[in-house]
Amino acid sequence: MLALQEAKDSRSKKVNKIEDVKALKSPMEAFARLEEYSKNGYDSIPAEDKSYFLKCFGIFDRPATPKQFMLRVRVTGGQLSFEQAMMIGELARKFGNDYIDLTTRMQVELRYLRIEDMPTILDELKSVGISTYQTGVDNFRNILIDPLEGKSTDSVIDATPIMRRLQESFLEKPEWISVLPRKFNTSISGSMANRSNIFSQDCAFVLANKNGEWGFNLYLGGKVGKIAKSADVFLRNSDEVELAFKAIITLFRDYGFRDNRNKNRLYFLLESVGIENFAKAIRTSAQKDFLTAGINMVQVEPYENQLGRVSLKDENFAVHMVVPSGIFSGTALMDAARACNVYGNGALSISVEQNIFMLGIKSSIVEPLLKEKIFERYKNINTPYFNNVIACAGTEHCPFGVIPNKPDAIEMADYLSKKVALPNDARVRMYWSACVKGCGINGLGDFGFEGCKTKVDGKSEYGVNISIGGKLLGESEEGHSLLKSVPLIYAKYYIEELMVVYATMRQANESFEKFYERVLQFYSRASLAFFMRINAYLKHNDMKRYVLELNEKPPTLGYEKFEVFEFGRKLYKNIIGTEAYTAYQDFAPLGNQKPANLKSVEKNINENIAQIVYKMIHPDVNQRAVVFSELVEEIPYI
């Protein structure tokens, strides 16, 4: 423990402003006054309760909807019984404008709620076994689990009972409400497929095998932009998982940093002390010498969104329903619950990708179920651009949002569905976050979109930072920056260019994640960005015949200097009709030839484009471009 104490002592003794607020009272004191607030109205609520304490119970004051609240509802394991789904749906209809958001923590959020109705809403939820405790601020957030945990054929261990044990250790326990330095995200899964964004959590228990024994490897320190690292710990059973979890949360409570609010997640404690020292502290605190890590068994790619149904261990089916951007309603939730109750066991499961599974559907009645009215609005199988899309709240509902986000994600998916059709076996994960907080887990998307502001003709406009190459397989991997500050109105045209490549070159049943690994990773990201920008410009200016094409096996192997010359050579030949030089060696010209002026052949070509291409193949090596960054910003948007 010495390393942890030394790390804590090395930090500033001055706590952050939120810690000062937390010292004013206990959260239970604020919650006890909820009935009083409901009688006296919004203006009777103290500022600290609106800004912090009520959030400990999922009650969020939302400036975007003055004097109205968002309620974040904890859906344990993302699982809703028929009675629970009907209750949430009815409450949304009665009190919340019939609006529901499905979230990336497998929960629901109700909006447009008045404080006057809040006690009634909470009582009704409690009557069906639903809590909103600890769904905000410095608390234990909903534990993520596979939405098909224990049911899918790739589920080796049913971790549901373990997840419930972990939740019982803190949920609605005053001694664990608002005592952490920062929020704490947990995930556990006994499945071989990563359906729960398992590696992006503060604490993750991942299916593993050691010497023929099934259990869980422990990963720690995940957050936005960072994948959790292996703690080199193997946990053999539910007792060991619970022991380790209690040790971890106690250590984080006692030694976590409370000075800089931006650097007090578990990740920063681990960075300070080293994960090896933290793992030793876990063993000491738990008084258990846990085994070292086994083999990570998360090796299967999920496929059910593409098939619309998945066969379960009990020979029934889980039927998928696509909810674009997670925008749902109380009426729709009730309709889904009723349909599932008639055709299945009435249970619904919310996925991390903001979609819904109906459980317990017998094979003989899947087709009749799909004829129900709910599937007219929410498709069983949508296009590959919709099946796996994620989008957080955005400017309409979130004070941190920079772009609208949810409608942007839908608009792009709709555009791409029409422009670049993909077969149902394709899989493209487009994850959208409206700001840098990353609630739409954009870093893990095949394409990630992060809202920002940018300039177009000197005017401020909505924009996105675009990343590529996020991975769910193996131990997951954050995507890499591709394009910065792209005007939102043009982003779809750039993505379209890589979708054309994917549609043309992909193999049967090949996801974009696998395609990126097989083809695109051998190009530098700078070259891909240039490819997207230049092709979009050429197509939108009636010069489609000049566009670049990518090779399945690029000869340049990601070496940017070579890529610049090779792309320039191809563009020149496409425009002029002949090679710029008669001979080449190592992606450079031989001889003293001087390429022709592009505008002498194509008078309509933009002067910037002509200069860019010439610079890429310039006969003077000292004037020839060697990196794309000096070229891409000179390309007009379209």
Regions found by a protein language model. Give the residues of each.
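Small-residue-enriched alpha-helical segments and adjacent helix-cap loops
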Residues: 42-47, 68-213, 323-459
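Long hydrophobic segments that form regular secondary structure
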Residues: 313-317, 325-350, 501-504, 508, ...
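Short glycine-/aliphatic-rich beta-strand segments at the starts of folded cytosolic domains
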Residues: 57-78, 309-326
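Mobile "lid/hinge" segments at catalytic clefts and subdomain interfaces of large enzymes
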Residues: 184-268, 448-504
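C-terminal lobe helix-coil module of Hanks-type protein kinase domains
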Residues: 564-638
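Intrinsic, low-complexity N-terminal interaction/targeting segments
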Residues: 49-64, 89, 130-133, 307-308
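Terminal amphipathic helices with adjacent charged low-complexity linkers/tails
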Residues: 257-308, 365-366, 529
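Intrinsic disorder at enzyme termini
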Residues: 530-559
